[in-house]
Swiss-Prot record:
SMART domains per record: S_TKc
Keywords: ATP-binding, Kinase, Nucleotide-binding, Oncogene, Serine/threonine-protein kinase, Transferase
Entry's family note: Belongs to the protein kinase superfamily. Ser/Thr protein kinase family.
Protein name: Serine/threonine-protein kinase-transforming protein mos
EC number assigned by the record: 2.7.11.1
Catalytic activity: L-seryl-[protein] + ATP = O-phospho-L-seryl-[protein] + ADP + H(+); L-threonyl-[protein] + ATP = O-phospho-L-threonyl-[protein] + ADP + H(+)
PANTHER family with a match to the protein in the record: SERINE/THREONINE-PROTEIN KINASE TNNI3K-RELATED, V-MOS MOLONEY MURINE SARCOMA VIRAL ONCO HOMOLOG
UniProt: ATP binding residues: L100, G101, S102, G103, G104, F105, G106, S107, V108, K121
Amino acid sequence: MARSTPCSQTSLAVPNHFSLVSHVTVPSEGVMPSPLSLCRCLPRELSPSVDSRSCSIPLVAPRRAGKLFLGTTPPRAPGLPRRLAWFSIDWEQVCLMHRLGSGGFGSVYKATYHGVPVAIKQVNKCTKDLRASQRSFWAELNIARLRHDNIVRVVAASTRTPEDSNSLGTIIMEFGGNVTLHQVIYGATRSPEPLSCREQLSLGKCLKYSLDVVNGLLFLHSQSILHLDLKPANILISEQDVCKISDFGCSQKLQDLRCRQASPHHIGGTYTHQAPEILKGEIATPKADIYSFGITLWQMTTREVPYSGEPQYVQYAVVAYNLRPSLAGAVFTASLTGKTLQNIIQSCWEARALQRPGAELLQRDLKALADSIEPM
């Protein structure tokens, strides 16, 4: 079967099921179970485990000129039920370019889908904790069908995998950019053009990026979604210099958290950015993301790492002794603007979640501060 869109070969080693996608065979039965139990808070039609067929979750459909549009239904393949046709990724249109990164979760590739640049995440089965891998895969789809300028959009996702692969599934996402906020802060970048990051992250730029992130959080929280792993490494910067929140593998829906109040479970994330209530095993709220944002804003402002020392000691000190990164630097004390920024950061990482501002109030304060300084 020939590809309808030719793909140039790459010298990088990539999985066979992508480089030879026209020869992929997928299991005809079976689907990865959802880690979420069915309850009154989770309707049956939203549970991925209800249908026994392998499924995908396409969120946009191709139209003219290979562009992707939201909310339209693609033509149904002959002989396929309506739902199964809607749940089909056009694998022949997947064309890998190169790998962007890899880790315990799997690998992310830059690619094109129907001629449009995308990022493709291949989620691996974790032999030590398969349940955690499954939970992470489905959590990535919490933003299914959502669209916002400051959120990396999911294009499609599928539990269909080659029979010989170690993959739980595939997620096709909007290509958010080559550079993360972490790379901009600390100087390392994968951008094809050299970037002297240490000279370019001005206070005005920090506030601009901060507003991008807060706008994304405000939208997520309005949809009752918590990110729960917000940090510079999970914020992409597009070619248009717009920050986009990515990596929703730890995200939660508020209604699902309410379902689990009687049986708390471990919430993933990065210990340096986790709120005290999360470290104590309490139920998460949107204010946990605000805490993480406060640490992230401190990193942007100081260009330093939050903590040093063993993780378990840091976690204990954050909860027991209210340990936080230092706000004593000149960037916070030498000017009225710095002192205002200091107050904003301090309010974000208050020990009690109720004392932290919501995303809407934070957006207002950051915009007022950004308007008070000279243009970038």
